[in-house]
A protein has these predicted regions:
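Gly/Ser-rich catalytic serine loop of serine hydrolases
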Residues: 3-4, 55-71, 148-166
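Interdomain regulatory linker/hinge segments that flank or connect interaction modules
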Residues: 10, 14, 82-136, 206-211
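PDZ/PDZ-like groove recognition
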Residues: 116-191, 211-213
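A structural signal for short beta-strand/turn segments enriched in small hydrophobics and glycine
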Residues: 12-18, 75, 163, 171-174
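Residues located in well-ordered beta-strands
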Residues: 28-32, 129, 146, 204, ...
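Active-site loop architecture of trypsin-fold serine endopeptidases
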Residues: 18-32, 37-67, 71-112, 185
Length: 215
């Protein structure tokens, strides 16, 4: 199977999900890309929250679809189906309500390549403490992730870390990551998690009411 560049996905594109929902083998469902870079939070075995900026789709996926491919109209893999939003009170009664999520193919391919090569995945960190916030700059109010002091350590920026080296400081609000809007702290965490070790990125920040880019 060929992997497409998930960075080139557009809202409204046709998609097809393949999987074994509820034990029904080789089931195909269709829909469209409903949204991009949708922060989705899951909890791992150690009760740590993991945030991924997912592809949101309206194709019906249910328990048993997770791990199955999501294709575009050209038959290329654009993601791996992972989870759904649900109004159910337990996972046993959860089912599709037209809001499903897939891990973008670019992230899938990078993680798979790292596991094949090194047997593990290396994740990056900015080295900052953040909180969801709103900020005004150039007459526009927007959401973002503001760097704030940790109640545990009393520091906002890790000394010598990537953010420190880029000149970020307490009170800066990050509003974009490589040109993609950062609406809250979960959005930023998703972009950071998708980045590879050694990647160079541009952050758009608001400092003292002014917008600027830092690398």
């Amino acid at each position: 199977m060929e992997f497409a560049d998930s960075d080139k996905l557009a809202v409204g594109e046709n998609v097809m999900a393949i999987g074994n929902p509820l034990g029904y083998d080789d089931t195909a469902t269709t829909g469209i890309v409903s949204a991009l870079n949708r922060p989705v939070t899951v909890t791992d075995d150690n009760n740590n929250e993991i945030v991924t900026n997912a592809v949101q789709i309206d194709a019906a996926i249910n328990p048993g679809n997770s791990g199955g491919p999501l294709f575009n109209a050209a038959g290329q893999v654009i993601g791996i189906n992972s989870s759904i939003a649900s109004t159910a009170t337990s996972s046993d009664s959860a089912g599709s309500i037209g809001i499903g999520f897939a891990i973008p193919s670019n992230l899938v391919k990078r993680v798979a390549d790292e596991i094949i090569k090194d047997g593990k995945v290396k994740h990056v960190a900015l080295g900052v403490v953040i909180k969801s916030d709103t900020v005004e700059a150039d007459g526009v109010t927007r959401g973002g992730a503001t760097i704030t002091k940790s109640s545990a350590t009393g520091s906002a920026v890790v000394s010598g870390g990537p953010a420190d080296k880029a000149g970020l400081k307490e009170g800066d609000t990050i509003v974009a990551f490589n040109g993609n809007a950062v609406n809250n702290n979960y959005s930023l965490l998703g972009y950071v998690r998708a980045a590879a070790l050694g990647d160079k990125v541009t952050l758009t920040i608001v400092r003292d009411g002014k917008t600027m880019d830092v690398d």
